[in-house]
Amino acid sequence: HQVVPTFLLWRLHNNISVMHRLGTERQFGNILEAARSEKDWKNVRAYLNMFNEYSIHLNHRQKEQTISFLYELLLNREGDIRRQAAALIGKMFADFNAGYRKELPKNMPDPDDKTALTLWEEYLGQLVCPDYRLTIQQKHRIQNALKFIMVSAMERSSEKVREELFTVFVKWFDGHHRLVGDPVFYLLDCIFSLPLDLCSKGDRLEQLIRFAISHMDDPDEKVQIAAVRVLKVLTQAVPPESACYEIACDAAHRINPRTITLLFLQYRIYTNLRLDTTAQREVLYGHDVVSDIFLENLKSATPWILKSVNIKLLADQVDHGKRDHLLHICAHFSNLIKVSEQVGVRHDAGRALLRLAHLLTTDQRNEIAVELLKGLEVGEYEFSKYIPEYLGEFALWLPPEQLDDIIERLHILLANGNERIVSVALDTLGVLLECYSRYTVRFHESEEVSEERRMKLLGLILSCLANYREQVRQEALLVIGQHIFGSQILAERDKSRMFSLCAKKLLFLLNENKGGELSLYYRAATLSHIDRFIAHYQLFGGLVETSTREKIAFFPGTFDPFTLSHKGIAKKIQELGFTVFLAIDEFSWSKKTQPHLVRRQI
């Protein structure tokens, strides 16, 4: 009865600590300066998580300062940081005027709306056409963030705000801006990423189609591909009676299919427009085109957008029954996840691999999973940090014996001396636990065995909260917050069951190793996820309960972890179904002298 209120009160205590730091201009400025001076991307992520949780409580001036800081982060060399910063910019614009505000008289225009839209227009200009003093690579990083900002803003904003923000964005396609090269490419890439229903409202559809068609003959190959790719998406919303149907058909006929990639896009456009696709089908599915695509995708000179389309082309080959190269295609996708320079290509390859996983045989699945696992063990975090998201889901296609083997190897990696390897192993366990409910549908096991494996995964994650390295503890906090209690995939009843089992242990471990300033931000974010879960479950599911210990045993005297007989006795009692409590007194052990607090940690 005390555990749940304690979590809520402790979350309140952490909120007060963080809000106190955000409350005054001086302290808020100090936080931004500390975040700007951080070199380690994981520490930067702690600040981003904190802003993500508390940005709605900031005043307008603080929001402007935060958006300015996030814009600077778009230059960061870490793709994950750029993506997270971009999504947060979109969220802050969507919620710019949200929160508790004074009620205005009727018919009085809101001056804050004008401020938000003016700021939005200003930043759109800086995103599409960055400062000329930046290097080409820095400009590309900023321009590439445009789509993540737009998608985040459109997803999170209300209908009224969404229309206002999108209306400002669409002005870039009215023909008044003389755009060439990269700005055109990234605008087209942004349109490709946005919801189709938003792009097809009113006369926007024709405007966007004309913009795409006008750049189909661009001398730059990547702009051509981007324009045709946008046309492929927009033609899904063009019925035969539409005013722009003839325009789209004429443009589709004008596409020069000089490469297999352009031919594939033309085939998809013809399909959307209900045109005859016999000639395209003959080339695509009548000949072996897979080996040429493999070669093209592994070339560093190939534009990333070409690789992205080729990934869909390879998956399409399998969908049309060409299974001869299935293992090679999946192995190719796993290689792209591990070595591709462009983050977007890695995610496209990962999604395609998961889509085809069910077609592989057991041996083939195991082969791919082992290759991905080897990628974790490399220790090059720049390459391995994108693997957990896909290895965690892919491993759930393995039969029980092989899945247990993967979990055991991840368990071994948690003891690695390299913090980066521990972090990716921990992330993989988080994804495994988050998606584990799918496993019981694919492989029939007794409920007892299935539940035991789930508890093992949870136990491995919790064990990292007791790690002696603060960075590992922070990663464990992140996994518990995002992959368990903040998950959109896990069912509420599964969260409740896990909470009832780990609540007391979690409460103790969170309080035991409080860490420094950055750990406060990680802990506050995790407690926010737990608090939201508790509130949601109590509102719709009933009371959140914690499990009680039926059989308890106290180990007499001082427990010595360096003595195998002590450990053996404790394990034996535990196997009998008892929860064993160990005592550590103030005196040193006889075999290995250590200070009291160090022994407590062990």
PLM regions and their residue ranges:
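Hydrophobic residues within the alpha-helices of tandem HEAT/HEAT-like
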Residues: 12-13, 51-56, 89-97, 146-153, ...
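Core helices of alpha-solenoid repeat scaffolds
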Residues: 20-29, 59-70, 112-124, 158-169, ...
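HEAT/HEAT-like alpha-solenoid repeats
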Residues: 28-39, 68-75, 109, 121-133, ...
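Nucleotidyltransferase catalytic core that binds NTPs
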Residues: 447-448, 454, 458, 470-473, ...
